[in-house]
From Swiss-Prot:
Keywords (A to Z) from UniProt: Cytoplasm, GTP-binding, Ligase, Magnesium, Metal-binding, Nucleotide-binding, Purine biosynthesis
Record's cofactor remark: Binds 1 Mg(2+) ion per subunit.
Pfam family, one: Adenylsucc_synt
NCBIfam families tied to this protein: PRK01117.1, purA
Sequence intervals crossing the membrane: none
Organism (species): Caldicellulosiruptor bescii (strain ATCC BAA-1888 / DSM 6725 / KCTC 15123 / Z-1320) (Anaerocellum thermophilum)
Function statement: Plays an important role in the de novo pathway of purine nucleotide biosynthesis. Catalyzes the first committed step in the biosynthesis of AMP from IMP.
Family in the record: Belongs to the adenylosuccinate synthetase family.
Enzyme nomenclature, EC number: 6.3.4.4
Residues reported to bind Mg(2+): 14, 41
Name of the featured protein: Adenylosuccinate synthetase
GO biological process entries: 'de novo' AMP biosynthetic process; IMP metabolic process
Gene from which the chain derives: purA
Length: 426
């Protein structure tokens, strides 16, 4: 493998990045999570078990890999500690986990504010996970948030908490009519978190760059995806960070010149959670069938995902923004059994055909997808195939069409949920 690889989601998240990272982590020495919080969820099936990871990189399932939670991640210590304990209970060591001392904290008031802000938006709600991620990033931008390193310095923590404590309580009590938080309880709680997490906390920027200089192979693991990026996604129905390659450099603390290969994870169909435009959405039995067969329910929230045909306008856009070199195609098996399969290649709007995703949500809502149709394949044919040439002709046509339309080669194909259900192409 190239020394530094970045794994990015090309759609609205839930593409199966966790499985791809888990597969590629075999060849890596270091796996890094660079942005987002516990609003994300990666599901990996290994050792006959299902692991649902929210903050910890998927490389943790390998004993000899260094796993880093970078400075761009916002961390809810309670959630992280629960995740660590859950892994340890299953016999998975977390000794090789390191947490950036520069990462920002999700505080209890962030979670309350997230929930109350969503409630007040009513029908205009954004569909957040209510985990406090947006408010934490807001405080980071306002330069009023607390960081992981502050949990290791009580004096510093007290000083920083005092500057925001009264204001947050005023908002909670006067605007949202909530019970005020108690300073002493917050302080005690986070000092306890700091003690538990202290062995994991370090300067990960130095650690990562020293690893690169030593020739270690690094995998940058994205959470969420391109269409949820704060700048490039379907704003305002986006996340509060940058799940694109540029965001990985900032959130991990490495220079862009080090990234040698960008891998885009593409689900063989499209899904999204929550509100926002979705041109290829299927509001029929086919959509329901894909949801049930693909187990399309949120790892973090359990919410049913909206399902639709593969949208190459979206994927093309992600390839352009991220400079994607190769594609890992996932969940090809979920489409098995459908007599006909459609792929969107453009959007028809006011007499024109758009080949890249528009900025305007009105255009995205009102456009008409332009489809190409393909013959389907059976589940037996997909399950029996262990190499590319053994795939049914119709599936190979589907894959080769994706390559032609996006300009990126497909090199991995997911044919089932298990770790070993992957075909290597070329």
């Amino acid at each position: 493998m190239q020394q530094i690889r970045a794994i990015v989601g090309t759609q609205w998240g839930d593409e199966g990045k966790g499985k791809i990272v888990d597969f590629l982590a075999k060849e890596a020495d270091v796996v890094v999570r660079a942005q987002g919080g516990n609003n994300a969820g990666h599901t990996v099936e290994a050792f006959g078990k299902v692991f649902k990871l929210h903050l910890i990189p998927s490389g943790i399932l390998y004993k000899d890999k260094l796993n880093i939670i970078g400075n761009g991640v916002v961390i809810d210590p309670e959630s992280l500690i629960q995740e660590i304990e859950s892994l340890e209970k299953e016999g998975i060591s977390t000794e090789n986990l390191k947490i950036s001392d520069r990462a920002h904290l999700v505080m209890p008031y962030h979670k309350i504010l997230d929930e109350e802000q969503e409630r007040l938006r009513g029908e205009e709600s954004l569909g957040t996970t209510k985990r406090g991620i947006g408010p934490a990033y807001t405080d980071k931008t306002e330069r009023t948030n607390l960081r992981v390193c502050d949990m290791l310095d009580e004096e510093e923590f007290v000083q920083k908490l005092r500057t925001v404590y009264e204001r947050k309580n005023q908002i909670l009590t006067h605007v949202y009519h909530k019970t005020p938080m108690k300073f002493g309880e917050l302080l005690e709680q986070f000092m306890k978190y700091g003690e538990i997490l202290k062995p994991y906390i370090t300067d990960t920027i130095k650690l990562l760059n020293d690893s690169i200089k030593a020739g270690k192979k690094v995998l940058l693991e994205g959470a969420q995806a391109t269409m949820l990026d704060l700048d490039y996604g379907t704003y305002p129905y986006v996340t509060s960070s940058h799940p694109t390659v540029g965001g990985f450099c900032i959130g991990a603390g490495i220079a862009p010149k080090y990234i040698q290969e960008v891998i885009g994870v593409v689900k063989a169909y499209t899904t999204r959670v929550g509100k926002g435009p979705f041109p290829t959405e299927l509001l029929d039995e086919i959509g329901n069938s894909i949801r049930e067969k693909g187990r399309e329910y949120g790892t973090t929230t359990g919410r049913p995902r909206r399902c639709g045909w593969l949208d190459l306008v979206v994927v093309r856009y992600a390839v352009l923004i991220n400079g994607i070199d190769k594609i890992a195609l996932t969940k090809l098996d979920t489409l098995s059994g459908l007599p006909k399969i459609k792929v969107c290649v453009g959007y028809k709007y006011e007499g024109k055909v758009l080949d890249l995703f528009p900025a305007s949500l009105r255009v995205a809502r009102e456009c008409e997808p332009v489809y190409e149709e393909f013959e389907g394949w059976s589940e037996e044919e997909i399950k029996a195939a262990k190499e590319y040439e053994a795939l049914p002709k119709s599936a190979k046509r589907y894959i080769e069409f994706i390559e032609k339309e996006t300009g990126a080669k497909v090199f991995l194909i997911g044919t089932g949920p298990a770790r070993e259900d992957i075909i290597i192409k070329d």
